[in-house]
Amino acid sequence: MSYQGKKNIPRITSDRLLIKGGRIVNDDQSFYADIYMEDGLIKQIGDNLIVPGGVKTIEANGKMVIPGGIDVHTHLQMPYRGMTTVDDFFQGTKAALAGGTTMIVDHVIPEPEASLTEAFEKWREWADGKTCCDYSLHVDITHWNDSVKQEVEALVKQKGVNSFMVYMAYKDLYQMSNTELYEVFTFLGGLGAIAQVHAENGDIIAQEQNRMLELGITGPEGHVLSRPEELEAEAVFRAITIASQTNCPLYVTKVMSKSSVDLISQARKKGYVVFGEPITASLGTDGTHYWSKNWAKAAAFVTSPPLSPDPTTPDYINSLLASGDLQVTGSAHATFSTAQKAIGKDNFTLIPEGTNGIEERMSVIWDKAVATGKMDENQFVAVTSTNAAKIFNLYPRKGRIAVGSDSDLVIWDPDAVKIVSAKSHHSAAEYNIFEGMELRGAPLVVICQGKIMMEDGTLHVTQGTGRFIPCSPFPDYVYKRIKARTKMAELHAVPRGMYDGPVYDLASTPKAGTPAGSTKGSPTKQTAPVRNLHHSGFSLAGNQGDESGVRSASRRIVAPPGGRSNITSLS
């Protein structure tokens, strides 16, 4: 039976609010003005506003007023091997609000062969009963057939879902073949949906995991050793290539390495419609912790793709986030207790994957990118809120301070300093991967649906008051270019006369013949040069190898200072 929505859940009674003396910061401009809110919407913006009586006034005192944050990647109340993450939809959204995030987009993960629609309705029921901020849902495609196609189409047209994630990893569970990826991307492009991808080479990971265990490496360090960044980069390159062939917009989740960031950056410079999503963990910390002598600490960092062991990676990713090469940020918040993580104490492949970050996301970005001078305040709003709203067709209802937009606002103090601690955070997780980190920038007041949710460090939240926000297909921000390319990319056969020459008679050839050059015996001399089909000059930068007719000399790939060389390149 289809889930019918909320029943007898307390609703927020929206307050009439007036924010005075604030500096409004959108993604494209900043200016001083007052803001009047009523019935959960922004009604007036300007100076000397005429407002009705009974209005609660908040003095911003020149502080920034920004759109509420949108966390585009969460895993709240996620089932895993008979367990559930410790942060359910109430605890998780409570932590989100404490950090300045007023909307989340969670992932629905159906079991393999299970109904996508039934899983979606299960997540709706869980979330409607517990969230205290607004939310939307991505749906993960964990298998592919004609029945799934019908469900995907119904979710887009009837249920308010416009984004679906596929997996290139987790062999024999969720992993899809290249053919399936091609079919999924083609289908989603026709529906006006966004194809999200978890990019890792699952086949090689499975082999490397076995190799590590055979070597006796069973701890968390085995996780990152079996998933080198080349395997993330290769999958990103492959996903970009397949999405390009199908003219489908691509959204790469959990961008964790320099190599992957570079590939996305180069693809965008060549005009490919691809978006990259770093997460709180990859922006704020690194993978050196996998070698901690404290098993529980090392296990707390286990997530996939793994954090890079190169300690310069977070700074690099922040730089490309600031430059616009990466567009959105999520937290991939999936918290397990130490006892839950410990089911993999003797085998790293069994450690539940996930880190915290829903509460810390906005402060980490401010501290690492804005306070360091990499990013201005407008770009901060873009990557924490506005771009997400545009990509998922929520703009300008979300991600903007404008008349008619939802009154989801944050008064932000750029000078506030907060020391992260599991003792004071609002997550139920007993360990925080940012423990002891001193972060500049924090919310002073958080307003969601026109109601004050946090003030003076105190939360005022009610379970079950969050709303499901449907996302419609064909967002302009994503699909305007796709539509233009579809018109330009019509293929036509070459008009020519019928061939009336001789045709070779295949019936006269030996049926058991072996193609030349493929026998398994001793190597023989080639009378003419034969192209190695495994050596391709293809590049998304547009350069084709051997254009001059001269074979390229073999090259040795040398690791540059600071890290390994990429196995794939878009330049």
UniProtKB/Swiss-Prot annotation:
Keyword Coiled coil: no
Designated gene of the protein: dpysl3
Annotated spans, Disordered: 509-571
Protein's recorded name: Dihydropyrimidinase-related protein 3
Assigned GO CC terms: cytoplasm; growth cone
Subcellular location: Cytoplasm; Cell projection, Growth cone
Upper taxonomic lineage: Eukaryota, Metazoa, Chordata, Craniata, Vertebrata
Keywords: Cell projection, Cytoplasm
Job of this protein: Necessary for signaling by class 3 semaphorins and subsequent remodeling of the cytoskeleton. Plays a role in axon guidance, neuronal growth cone collapse and cell migration.
Biased composition (Polar residues): 516-529
InterPro entries: Amidohydro-rel (IPR006680), Hydantoinase/dihydroPyrase (IPR011778), Metal-dep_hydrolase_composite (IPR011059), Metal_Hydrolase (IPR032466), Metallo-dep_Hydrolases_sf (IPR050378)
Keyword Ubl conjugation: no
Matching Gene3D superfamilies: Metal-dependent hydrolases, Urease, subunit C, domain 1
Family named by the database record: Belongs to the metallo-dependent hydrolases superfamily. Hydantoinase/dihydropyrimidinase family.
Superkingdom, taxonomy of origin: Eukaryota
Cited PANTHER family: DIHYDROPYRIMIDINASE-RELATED PROTEIN 3, HYDRANTOINASE/DIHYDROPYRIMIDINASE FAMILY MEMBER
Molecular functions (GO terms): hydrolase activity, acting on carbon-nitrogen (but not peptide) bonds
NCBIfam families: D-hydantoinase (TIGR02033)
Subunit structure: Homotetramer and heterotetramer.
